[in-house]
Swiss-Prot record:
GO terms for molecular function: 3'-5'-RNA exonuclease activity; nucleic acid binding. CDD domains: Orn (cd06135). HAMAP family: Oligoribonuclease (MF_00045). It comes from Vibrio parahaemolyticus serotype O3:K6 (strain RIMD 2210633). Its EC number is 3.1.15.-. It holds the Pfam family RNase_T. It is an enzyme of class 3 (hydrolase). This is Oligoribonuclease. The active site is at Y129.
Amino acid sequence: MSFSDQNLIWVDLEMTGLDPETHKIIEIASIVTDSELNILAEGPVLAVHQPEEELAKMDDWCTNTHTASGLVERVRNSKISEQDAVAQTIEFLEKWVPKGVSPICGNSIGQDRRFLYKHMPELEEYFHYRYLDVSTLKELTRRWKPEVLDGFSKQGTHLALDDIRESIAELKYYRETIFKI
């Protein structure tokens, strides 16, 4: 185990929609990497139970995607509450990174943070105020060197742990191709 203030916390959520005021978190996963993006540990992958009335608020894209992946069924069968998910995730993070030092890392991570702020504020407070958002590099690459984007593709399973692994791989790709480090 390598507890360090240099470690990075990667998070991904799956939600019933895009508005934290009306939609809910249905899956959370986390990974801790070192500063060189080597995976040190994978946290719990948790389907968060939500009642049928919350699942009914999903649009067609969410319903189709989360049903096809098996996530809707996992959510229905889950006994994990939002608070349980917070407690289990923090318990994992405390073994690897001190509170308040790691930026929240991921792809379009601002959206996830909005949901954490609304539905899991205790977990949101575990992160530094900064973001490490891979999608920022993607947007800059799309504008300044679009041919580089052809060299990386995602599976797009929209399962939280898979999405984190892809985000880490994508950042490694940009480091090697754009930054040449």
